[in-house]
């Protein structure tokens, strides 16, 4: 079994759980985006002594975003620190382009492409420095529901020393917002897949109005 936790794990108890999962044949990856996060993981793992280093993915982010490294230089500093850790194994890179928006609520491709290029550049630089852990394959992952076709196209052309596995993380927990994705998705009103593959609204939610405190507000 393989699971990607698309977040940093910095709570000691949760890090201990991850360490124990390694001894049970369970392959789990989490993100790393700071020296502070590395220090927390090192401190906990030094006490737990996992059977092998915990695999982590270096996370890139965008200005104003929730997480992730903002620049190539910052990313390489963190990658070098992971490579020095006896308890962590740098096994790939990651990012999330889904929150990149322009022209109101409708995402556009250009800033997404620039962000993907940044992930590619960081991956190449880490690979050139030999900081990726020798493993059966290198994982590069991004995810969003509007431009996953761009993600696959750009990341799958990466050339690395290790075999490459591209993972897309598109899809919400239960359902999507049909309104915005009907316009933006490569399987929306204007398909970009080369086929007439269109997403169809499959869930309708009913609710009860509890209050109308003022005109036009419910």
Q: Where are the regions that the model predicts?
A:
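Glycine-enriched alpha-helix->loop->beta-strand junction motifs that scaffold or abut catalytic
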Residues: 1-3, 22-27, 46-53, 108, ...
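Short glycine-enriched loops at secondary-structure junctions
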Residues: 8-11, 36, 96
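Short, charged, surface-exposed secondary-structure boundary motifs
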Residues: 13-18, 40, 177-181
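Acidic (Asp/Glu)-rich catalytic clusters
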Residues: 18-25, 42-54, 79-89
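Active-site loop/helix belt of alpha/beta enzymes
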Residues: 55, 61-193
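Flexible, acidic glycine-rich loops studded with aromatic residues
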Residues: 196-218
């Amino acid at each position: 079994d393989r699971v990607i936790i698309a977040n940093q794990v910095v709570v000691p108890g949760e890090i201990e759980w991850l360490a124990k999962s390694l001894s049970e044949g369970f392959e789990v990856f989490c993100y790393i985006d700071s020296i502070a996060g590395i220090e927390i993981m090192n401190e906990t793992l030094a006490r737990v002594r996992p059977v092998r280093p915990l695999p982590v993915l270096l996370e890139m982010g965008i200005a104003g975003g929730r997480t992730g490294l903002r620049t190539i230089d910052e990313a390489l500093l963190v990658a070098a620190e992971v490579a020095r850790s006896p308890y962590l194994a740098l096994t790939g890179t990651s990012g999330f382009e889904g929150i990149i928006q322009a022209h109101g609520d409708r995402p556009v491709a250009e800033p997404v492409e620039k962000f993907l290029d940044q992930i590619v550049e960081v991956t190449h630089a880490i690979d050139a420095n030999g900081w990726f852990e020798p493993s059966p394959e290198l994982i590069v992952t991004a995810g969003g529901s509007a431009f996953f076709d761009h993600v696959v196209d750009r990341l799958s052309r990466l050339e690395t020393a290790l075999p490459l596995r591209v993972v897309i993380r598109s899809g919400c927990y239960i359902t999507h917002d049909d309104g915005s994705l009907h316009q933006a998705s490569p399987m929306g009103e204007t398909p970009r897949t080369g086929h007439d593959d269109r997403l169809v609204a499959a869930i309708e939610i009913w609710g009860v109005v509890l209050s109308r405190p003022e005109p036009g507000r419910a």
